[in-house]
Amino acid sequence: MSTANTAASASLAQHDSTHGTVTWRLMPLLLVCYLFAHLDRINIGFAKMQMSSDLHFSDTVYGFGAGLFFIAYALFGVPSNMALDRVGPRRWIATLMIVWGALSTGMLWVESASGFYVLRFLLGVAEAGFFPGILVYLNRWYPARRRGQITALFAIAVPMAGVIGGPLSGGILELFHDAAGLRGWQWMFLIEGAPVMLLGLVVLKRLPDSFEHVSWLDAGQKQHLREQLASEEQRKSITSFGGILRNRQVWLLVAVYFAVMLAVNTLAFWMPTLIHGAGIGSDGRVGLLSAIPYLAGCLFMIACGRSSDRQRERRWHLCVPLLMSALGIAVAGLAPGNPLMVLGGLIVAGMGASAALPMFWQLPPAFLSNTTQAAGIALISSFGSIASFLAPYLIGWMRDTTHSASLALYVLALFIALGGLLVLRTRAAIVNPQ
């Protein structure tokens, strides 16, 4: 018995060492890439404070343009992920980053609603394959029991983009306003978009396509990864694209992800406006206060990921954050002129939304084989993009119609809560890691 325990401990230590090496080699670069990806999504929420006034955009125009990104994201997610398999992760991800960096920088030349719509749509086309593609990529390096912390580590870029992007964007709007003949929002798109093109070149040079092609893992470590991933592959039930479309659990996950994206994008596109509407006048102060919900989200996301992996439980670790997000969004709508109520609600919502995103992405790989992950994850992500369109558009339309976002926030909170309850309809025996 002692010999068996010693052998098991040695094997576990070897696995830990292998995955530690992989994490150190991959995650810093991927984390920075996703941080810029999400920064390029949410900076439009800060630009709105000046851009809408300068270009005479109504809240409906802003909400529709912000949401168009996700219509393109929905349409091009599956083909983009299929291209990742054909072209290879390194070249495809680098290409996407260079293109979206150029388009994001190009936002500084927007002069009309039509130009705003076109660039937002094209930006969605370029980014459509990035997040689902990275998820597929990581699933080919890590076994299920380690994905909770790893996906949380990767997805921490979402709240970190808010922590960094809020003060950065607010500061640029104030400090660079009218410098060299450009408005503050134009400088913001330039400063935050141009580095992405350079980062794409780094990805082209540094990101390995798979663990089979790296020199920093020895033959034994590669064999450990092969064995772990192969043993999981045998337990998966969906092995064809037709199987994806016919599986009821996949469509249940689509509904849950719809709720997750309602939560994430309500905050991403309207949090600065909600804080500003609560009586915070300065762009810089709005940026600083917007960082607080994201900072709380970072801490809660890490704790949730660790707890989920330690307990080998996924469903409640997703259900509870979604219910938290629904509660926080509803509270933010109760007293839109009260800064403490609004900020308190947004902090709870930010914690829930931040944790829900990486927790959700533990579920699809439990059903999808390696051959169907690219298409399946892209399909789920694409339907979630519809929610990402509806959240900013609904709030913008309701603000123009009723001069308040409260009713829209209540409706969104209801659907987010329903999504949280739907999580419990998934099969625990399948989604919880063995």
Language-model segments: which ranges?
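Helix-breaking motifs and short loop linkers at transmembrane-helix boundaries and internal kinks
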Residues: 56, 88, 109-115, 126, ...
